[in-house]
């Protein structure tokens, strides 16, 4: 499959890295020669220097009817124009367009019928994730599956957790009426597929599946539950900061800080119950005057990673109970000290997940990357009768020939969810959620979801 990536920024480079390691013929376009040279040195791909929306550039990059175009530059307008030209002039197979401005997302028909096949709005996705994390304190990552009926949750085990230093199967006796399944644990950065006799240890990174209503009680098994939050301070009144404030202000006490006077005036008009303050998140006197020591959750959501990191450090030093930040450079994620930054959310990871979902072979409603560097992800797909699935029907799940590092975490059949289902026999058209840990043959999993 031919993939043409437009834009070699963080998202484009991450896509190039991920897709070039799979069975794709990847080309990438950017105006920055140095970025393209680095990518060409590191990965098996082709590069083209030029403007992403220029017809000659697209032609030189190989755009044709077999090409899928991923327009992920930092300019919505460039992405839109690129998709229009790629479709109308080169009749490309599919266009996927990254759009930051929700106004564009709501007006796709204005750009011509069929010019943009799939539009993705990472800012909306980031906001939804932030809301989930604020509503479920203690969880470090929450992803939705099965149309929202199941959540995959990451939580770090602490020594005060009820299940720590006990066997995993003890969760059933602790919570007999709660249905959950733990498909993966990361211990000291390395993945393991647990069983009932696995001892939960402090600092284990545990992934579990459960209904949203059960998340908080399961988190409490792994760590002492954080106290409920009512006071939230947001640094950055951009698209994400303002959307988060708007989504939470009816249920929480919100303060939002932005250095731009004009932006503050806009926020004051758009928000009803949020206190809007002009200033910087790194202004110690401002934070003290706004009683930072009483803030339950401090969210640094500007477009500048360093500002977000330093603001979170300062807020924690001054007494904020919990810090959540946005980090655009994913390499920062693994080096941030947890005593200052509780949760770092990566728009880059979310965008790559959204794109991969639409590139997946077969019938795949959802695909989520949990860890970009280690390759951990989960795929929700519908298993069909085809030449690859002959050995997968009329056999217990425990006997299926899955690649190493893969586990079927749940089966959804006629709106019924089955977990702990080692003896369940798969049927055609079952929806399954597969966790893939580390480097494994992902194509073998995707082949299960092919329709013929």
Range-by-range predicted roles:
Residues 1-452:
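Cytosolic regulatory regions of ion transport systems
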